[in-house]
Amino acid sequence: NFYSYGQIIRNKLPEISGFYILHEGFLSVLDDELIEEDYDDIQEKKFTRTAQEGFVGISDKYWITSVIPQKGKEFKTTFDYKNKFRANYISTQGTEVGPNSSIEEKIQIITAAKRVNIIDGYAENLKINKFDLVIDWGFMYFITKPLFFALDYFFKLLGNYGLAIIAVTICIRLAFFPLANFSFKSMGKMKLLAPEMARLKELHKDDKMKLQQAMMALYKKEKVNPMSGCLPILVQIPVFFAFYKILFVTLEMRHMPFYGWIKDLSDRDPTSVFNLFGLIPWDPPSFLLIGAWPIIMGITMFIQQKLNPTPPDPIQAKIFMFFPLFLTIILAPFAAGLVIYWSFNNIFTMIQQYIVQSKMTVKTT
């Protein structure tokens, strides 16, 4: 009997990125189910699964090697480690070959860079189900991949992925325009109520319970929702993580420059405020690399905060005041493209918020 067999061997454990948002290791789609297994897990225990169709592979950040068995024949997949990492399959039912006869069985082997057009081309032309998942789009696939196509469209139009990020940011702002307008109008009302809120704080300064009740009564009377300012931020959190995912996993973003000192949008801003952005001949350690773009992002966030009403709670107000500085430090190691997106998102938000609140001020005077 003849049994179809295929195997991918990795001789030693590679250097992997080690980031939770990216899978590097064994990867397969078996009967429509995505299977991802880490190297260290397979060293401890082998993986076995029987399927009717799919593919078997080993995936790096930017590369994939895979074997696709012939469709219509059941096969067993095994990931194991015996001094080498092995991903293999073998058909479960043999084909009898008689004397002076032959059979033909076609399997496909793909070793490719994870460029989206290449991977999607293989998936479509070879009819490989879910082969596009070899690029780790994440659980927000339905946002991440369309967002990449939007970026790629503007890249082809404008010739620079940094400009494409800005263009997509404008489109996102336009998409959320009605929600943002509602939020800014509510915050504008909150700002106009500041004198009355100050009066209530003075009146009930010794009784926090009565102050809270008076505040809630004021909000109800003026039809103001103090939490409405959070809505635009909450809605855009998935977009933020989708941008992060795209910049981290797609080969198209690797070594793509922006204007000025940004030579790779997928890497952090290489400048540092601690050596005056290169004017002092000193290379600070990585934790001190707070570059120009993170600082620009922090400044835009600080200015944007000034357009918002001051929180009634003094402790909350202090936390909000230091929040831009906190985010500047947190986002400094992130991809420059992500920080550029957040900076321009802040700028467009400020413009919209200023226009809405200016109109409200004119109406009340």
PLM regions: where:
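Hydrophobic alpha-helical segments of integral membrane proteins
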Residues: D136-L158, L193, M215, W261-I262, ...
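Hydrophobic core segments of alpha-helical transmembrane domains in multi-pass membrane proteins
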Residues: P294, G337-N346
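Membrane-interface amphipathic helices and adjacent TM-edge segments
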Residues: N100, L174-F240, V249, T300-A332, ...
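Short, membrane-interfacial amphipathic segments enriched in basic
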Residues: D132-K145, E202-M209
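Transmembrane helix interruption/hinge and helix-loop junction motifs
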Residues: L158-Y161, I329-V339
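Soluble non-transmembrane domains of integral membrane proteins
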Residues: N1-N129
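Conserved catalytic motifs of ABC-family nucleotide-binding domains
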Residues: K245-G298
